[in-house]
Each structure stands twice: as structure tokens, then as C-alpha cells.
């Protein structure tokens, strides 16, 4: 049985892993689903001052408090930025890194910077305009959630996702990732899981980049961006087998 830490994406919270975590626990795995500062049940802590570093520390703190090691660490979407930083800070404790339809950053990358790399210029401009535009319009420094329909989330789940998602600090997308701990060298396996049922997706870029790369394995699930919501049993089976 494995120690599995599931890290959500932007504007979501630990709530989004509900069904996936339930299936994994039923199979005997230890599962943690930390929520980032400022979203989910921690939305009352929301602030434009929250950064990527804040969220990295959130997850590091969870792992240290739960005294977990030999971890399968899975990050969804923006969570790919977070788990990369977490693995860097915890040398020897993360066994497998899973990028679930997620960004795969290198040192110095920001999420918004990666959009320019992963998407056609006009599509990247639309995403960036939405993120920066809503933060500016609200005079709060907070981005509004993208509607679930844009990610092709199953109609039965869209209202639940839209109801639960909240605004998130733009700074989390603008701050570059700073790697300093050397922990990534100790990760034994990296898995990329592409959600192959929606577009325009920046994540096809990463799946193509790492398919066949040494130390990587690429899987595809035919569904929306929110795999953990729409295909929890399939995702749990994949994670539980790692």
C-alpha cells in the first residue's frame, strides 16, 4: 500500500479529490488531500499576497505533519507547479511524481510563462487575458475561476465544480518556481497523465514532450480536464498501481 498525496489545481480545493480519495482509501492506501491557502475551506484566508511559494509550503507542511515518506505525489493542473517545488524541498521522501493534466516547470518557470510555450500565441493570449483581466477588474489581485464547461467537465458534475471553485491570487501564476533543495534528483519515477477529452489544452505539449523520455511514463485518459471528478475510479486504479 502507498502513501499518496493529491494536490489540487487552481481555484479548487481538497474537495475535488473526494471520490478518488475514497476509492484509494478503500483499497488500503494512505491518502492526504491538502487544500491550498486561500481556496476551498481556506477561502477565508484569501489574499492577493498569496504566491506559489505559499502553496508549496502548504503541502510540505502537510507531508511533514503526517510524517509521510515513499510518497506518490500527484499534482493536477496548476498543482504541477506546486508538486515540483514540494519534491525539490523534500529530498528522498517523494518516490513518484504524477502530473495529472498538469504543468511541468523547470527552475525559473512561472505558470503564465509556460502558457506561452505550450499554446499557440493567440490561445495563450486569451488565457492570460482572462487571468490578468479578472484580477485587474476586481481590484483584488484575484483571478476568477474558469467555468467547468470550458474544461468539458461532465454535465452532471459541472454545477458542483462551479459552486465549489473560488477566486485565487494572480501572483500564484506569475511567480517563478525557485528550485533549491535538490530533491528532484531523488524521484524514482515520473508519470504524466493527459486528459485527452478537451481543448484547447496546454497539456498536450507536456505529454508529447515527455513521451518516450527517460524516467517518464505517459498515460492518457479520455475525459475532461478534471479527471479526479469525472473519472475517479479509473484514476484511483492508475495511482494505486504505481
Tell where the protein language model's regions lie, with residue ranges.
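Conserved HGGG/HGGXW glycine-rich cap/lid loop of the alpha/beta-hydrolase fold
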Residues: 2-43
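Active-site loop/oxyanion-hole signature of alpha/beta-hydrolase fold enzymes
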Residues: 30, 36-72, 88-89, 112-116
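Short beta-strand immediately N-terminal to the catalytic nucleophile in serine-hydrolase-like folds
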Residues: 73-75, 100
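Flexible "cap/lid" loop of the alpha/beta hydrolase fold
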Residues: 93-94, 98-135, 139, 172-173, ...
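Active-site nucleophile elbow and catalytic-triad environment of alpha/beta-hydrolase enzymes
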Residues: 163-182, 198
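Short beta-strand/loop motif that positions the catalytic acidic residue
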Residues: 192-194
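Conserved loop-alpha-helix segment in the C-terminal half of the alpha/beta-hydrolase fold
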Residues: 196-229, 242
